[in-house]
Design a protein with these regions (language model features):
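Aliphatic-rich helix starts adjacent to a transmembrane/signal segment
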Residues: 1-38, 42
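Long, hydrophobic/aromatic-enriched structural stretches that serve as scaffold segments
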Residues: 1-9, 61, 73-82
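Residue-level marker of positions within ordered structural domains that often coincide
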Residues: 11, 42, 46, 83, ...
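Short helix/strand-bridging catalytic loops that position acidic/His residues to coordinate divalent metals
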Residues: 18-25, 55-64, 93-101
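A sequence-level detector of short, solvent-exposed, charge-rich linear segments
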Residues: 21, 25, 29, 52, ...
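Short, glycine/small-hydrophobic-rich surface segments
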Residues: 43-78
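Intrinsically disordered, low-complexity regions enriched in Pro/Ser/Thr/Gly and acidic residues
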Residues: 80-287
Length: 287
């Protein structure tokens, strides 16, 4: 008579322990991902808003078309200026390599894309969604050598990289345009495909398994725009004019332990986190 209730109690305790462990792991992973994105985004010189990512009547070259991968939606896209230490041989040294104490430092631009992804090759990931990251960086060159010198390029650009079109006119009337118009002109190197993005975090909410809702991006800034689906596993409020973004992540610990993994409103098993970051880098000379 005592065995059945006791067994039920033990199963209940074990189930609760499993849920709590899954929740704790998910909370930690969400915070770790936010910390990583915060450090990454702090180096930004330009952040794309929804108009830049998804297009508009005024922008017929959305950057999503340039950074497209199957089963992935770009949610956070920005340019940053990377510091490269001990890369450039001193003036008068024609080689590609030099000792660390003699090398000069330099900066190079790179494009960073964070995706909300349901891509799952060979079912190696969870049934939930993921956040994936792509970075493509410009070449590192020896600024002391002519461009036709064999040693001019120290490290080649990543596949698919094209320079930022800052000096390009935005229309056929030779109008220079503003910064947003210039950045919206960027196109990838069509002769070279990107390497695939890498997973930053698994077990985030998908669009179909989250509670519906709205997000007021004006709380971030008056001109911030929503990118992605509100209250999904990954979305942002981005303001290109201020190089500013608020990043939201909703984890899904239920996907670790059960098939029915829909996140209800305020579910403790679908922990959320956010971070607001303003890029601190500036455009400048590089290479």
């Amino acid at each position: 008579m005592i065995t059945a209730p006791l067994l039920t109690f033990v199963v209940s305790v074990l189930d609760r322990d499993v849920r709590e462990e899954a929740k704790a792991n998910t909370e930690q992973e969400v915070q770790t991902a936010l910390d990583y994105i915060e450090q990454d985004l702090a180096q930004a010189i330009y952040v794309y808003d929804s108009t830049g990512i998804n297009g508009s009547p005024q922008n017929n070259n959305p950057i999503k078309d340039q950074v497209e991968f199957p089963n992935r939606s770009p949610i956070l896209v920005f340019w940053k200026r990377n510091f490269e230490e001990n890369k450039i041989p001193p003036q008068g040294d024609p080689s590609r390599n030099c000792s660390e104490k003699d090398c000069d430092d330099t900066y190079v631009y790179s494009l960073v894309v964070y995706y909300h992804s349901t891509n799952n090759p060979n079912n190696i990931w969870s049934d939930a969604a993921r956040i994936e990251r792509l970075e493509i960086q410009d070449q590192i060159v020896n600024r002391f050598l002519p461009k036709d010198d064999d040693n001019y390029v120290i490290e080649p650009a990543d596949k698919g990289f094209n320079s930022i079109p800052l000096d390009k006119n935005v229309d056929d009337n030779n109008n220079l345009g503003d910064l947003q118009q210039k950045m919206n002109q960027w196109t990838k190197d069509k002769d070279k495909d990107f390497d695939p993005p890498k997973v930053l975090i698994d077990y985030v909410g998908t669009v179909g398994t989250v509670v519906a809702g709205t997000v007021d991006c004006t709380n971030v800034s008056t001109s911030a725009q929503l990118v992605g689906t509100a209250n999904s596993g990954f979305y942002t409020c981005a303001d290109s004019s201020k190089t500013l973004a608020k990043v939201f992540i909703r984890g899904n610990s239920l996907a670790r332990i059960q098939d029915n993994n829909r996140c209800t409103a305020n579910s403790t098993y679908c922990p959320t986190g956010s971070v607001t970051v303003q890029g601190r880098s500036l455009f400048g000379s590089y290479n």
